[in-house]
Amino acid sequence: NNNGNLGLYQKRLYYMEQIQTYFTDDDTEKGFSTLLKTMFNNLDTTQHTNFDENVRKQFIGSAQSLATYFNGVATNLQELQGTLNNEIKSTVDNVNSIAEKIALINKQINQVEINGGHANELRDKRALLVDELSAIVPVEISEVPITNSNYPDMDLGINKYTVKINGQTMVDGYDYRTLSYEAREQKINQTDIDGLYDLTWSDTGVKFNAASASMGGSLRALFEMRDGNNAENFTGKIGTEAGSIQNTVVDGRTVTQITVKNPSMTDVEKLSIAEQGIITVLNNDYLYSDFTMNADGSYTFTLKQELNASQRSKFLGESVSIGKSVDAMGIPYYMSQMNQFLRSF
């Protein structure tokens, strides 16, 4: 809806403009292009002045300025990722609060209208809450009369008001559900800060994918900017050959190693996955303690657990992924671009 689109684009624009300030390069502030050009100009001057000591110091100073610039941008991006993470938390708290208020108003409206009264003021209040919610997440509402179960044609004069967010029921008459945020124990990207939140439904523990294509509103924008990788997360397929999945002993413990073929990341300079983290196979998450990139371009991940023979058999040829494909240029994307430049420099 229009409200959701407005919430999405306003929040996205706000944080994109902040990121843009980190890459400013103009007369008021020297940025990447200027610092890089200055460093190479100083290097060229050094070569043409028989490596004069003062000129060499000037080159070293310009190289240090470039390094300081990259460190500063990285720090700013990570701090912004923390700000986004905190806003996700406060936004979820607000969503839960709105759901609670709507459920309470539903009851108040029915208490007034069952006795023949008019609850216009309460209905207006509820409509404002729904408008606020729809700017955060996609909202669907329905209101149907409640009838006598013994006499279906008998209208009781009260209604059941339901609110769904992203297709899932959040308010059901007088009852409501809440979302929970849980800090990740493992990083997805090398440069992620600790404690990024994932969302689940509090009652079922089922994941709530706030960055999915079906989402809208400001909550999606927050996740896009915090986790956006330009749809370039790690993917691949476990090999089908013998030895693609095998158990081994590490530090006295039996664990399983899986070899991933045809990975989406074949250039080590572009590699951004965490040294240890979570790999997803058959919609289940598994912790890995480390990984190696093999000479043939495949990857071998050492899981923190031992898979039984049945599990190993099911894994053969299956797709794997690390993190989600988030089609937005968020913090991970810019951090990855900087790392890629520095590794190839």
Language-model-detected regions and their locations in the chain:
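Structural signature of extracellular appendage/secretion-system components
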Residues: 1-344
